[in-house]
Amino acid sequence: MVVNGSGESDWPAVAALAGRHPDLLPAFGCHPWFLRERTADWKGSLAHWLDRLPASSVGEIGLDRWMLENPERWRAHLGREAGDPPSMDEQEEAFVIQWRMAAERNRPASLHCLKAFGPLLALLEATPRPARGFLLHSYGGPAEMVPAFARLGAYFSVPGYFMHPRKARQREVFRIVPADRLLIETDAPDQLPPASGIRHALTDPRTGLPLNHPANLPAAGESMAQFLGVSAAELAVRTSANFERLFGPYSAP
């Protein structure tokens, strides 16, 4: 299981968590929502953590046009005072820096993208990529872009959240994702699945609201298996192999 960082302030905690639990794979990156929280030495700090922990990946990084179109909702989601969201130019600059670090080290990268799939595809086509591939987490892009991303080495993960009836359109996109590029995720603590996908209810002590967590992963896999018309066991074997290929020890083809 991968634990993604969102910014400099949580990278030590990510590393410590992975140190306590050997089954966890740490990831370090600056999420586009938190770019304004970087220090002057953020690039050196990122390189430090990636080089200190060779099993680590880069993430979560990406592009987000949604927050530029919905700044008040973005601020509300952050739960604290914030200025204007980072511009697309600022996001693209930070993304390319981190993406190149992943490519130079051949580390997988977990990508966040909201309403910016065209610019993201253009950047990926124009820059060197990790040979082992990368993950488009909670893929919310159009079906017609799946082949283009897949040709560049993309894997596509589906969260339990996509089992909500209102996400039917996006769920359908995963019917055309190549079988050897599909992964399952929770995106915990965000993207709470439907009640049927919650195995162990948790409450966020800060808000009193239900909290998503990794133990909901099996239910997400079972729901996706039913949707795709395969057994849960078959999908578990398939996605486990995909996970090992992307995040496990690398073997050149």
Would you name each region that the model predicts?
Residues 1-253:
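Mid-domain alpha/beta scaffold segments of enzyme catalytic cores
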